[in-house]
Amino acid sequence: VTLLTRVDCHACERAVVDVSRICGELNVRWSVSDVDSDRSLRAEYGDRVPVILVDGEEHGYWEVEEERLRAALTG
């Protein structure tokens, strides 16, 4: 799981907490990337952070849908 965020994004801060908890409970590795540190990430995802990527594919954005994320990580 990769969580795309940016500095001073309150929704991103909430997403970090949620993704950290969910991935921790499921023993799934995850990371955070700042969209503003990479031009291609900013161009593709910059208007809808936070964005959750699962196996490199966009899973969701703006908020963490816990049940849906859990299903993707356990199914």
Residues of each region from the PLM?
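Thiol-based oxidoreductase modules, predominantly thioredoxin-like and allied folds used
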Residues: 28-39
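Short glycine-biased active-site loop of nucleotidyltransferases that positions the nucleotide triphosphate
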Residues: 42-44
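Structural micro-motif
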Residues: 46-52
